[in-house]
Amino acid sequence: RMRVAESRVEQWARRGADVELLDADRTSELLGSPFWHGGWMANTGGTVQPLAYTRGLAKAAAGLGATIHTQSPVTSIKREGSVWLLKTPEGELRADKVVLATNAYTDEVAPDLRRSIVPVYSFQMSTRPLSDNIRKSVIPGRQAVSDTRGDLHFFRWTDDGRLVTGAALFFKHNPTGRLPQHVGDRVLRAFPQVGEVSFDYIWHGFIGATLDKLPHLHVLGPGFFAWIGCNGRGVALAS
């Protein structure tokens, strides 16, 4: 697994990024845990609050003259002469250019596109606010963390001292009842100093996974583009 980290550091460094390869001791120092064998860090990285960021983008777009229609699912897209005809339950729209950015929620509007990804059900969870002592010992630098496991471990802090983590769906029966225990156990394996783990908030949805783990840009027709397959990193990749 360290070969993956070494490869990433080499790739990013060639492009001028400020990156650092971490041995086990340095990783333990940064994360407050000996759970990982090593890793790498992008020193210019950061985190955003996704909902606040989305609202900010919407406000900026509206300020530049964009019109945003919510609760208006497009049910079909067809070429009509030199434009595209988009139908919704309440009306129609004609456009010179169309961008389909529905990712894991791509439906029968573009069936071939839908079959190009694997929808994976992903859960995220936020703990109760944790004590100052815990916050000083668990990822004290407040970096966002993820690893190379298939069902990767990931962690980040919120402004009010909650640890956010999660997992992909493995349980078909009662997932919201069973996952908190599963994820809580993972937290304690990585950070036993947290003690009892309880989650105040749980949210979930689909991510669009691709076989090569890269997002795909498709040209579906004249002026008709699709962006799909963000593999759980849509906020960063789409920005």
What are these regions (language model features)?
Residues Q11-A24:
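A short alpha-helix-loop-beta-strand transition element characteristic
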Residues V74-S76, G81-W84, T88-P222:
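Active-site substrate-recognition segment that forms the wall
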Residues E20-L22, T67-H69, S198-I202:
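General small-molecule cofactor/ligand-binding pocket signal
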Residues F199, H216, P222-S239:
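Conserved mid-domain beta->alpha element of the FAD-binding
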Residues M2-A5, E20, G46, P50, ...:
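Generic structural signal for well-ordered, non-membrane alpha-helical segments
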Residues I68-T70, A104, F224, L237:
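Ligand-binding pocket scaffold of soluble enzyme catalytic domains
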Residues R3-A13, P34-K97:
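Helical element adjacent to the flavin cofactor pocket in flavoenzyme catalytic cores
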Residues R26-P34:
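Flexible hinge/switch segments at interdomain interfaces of large molecular machines
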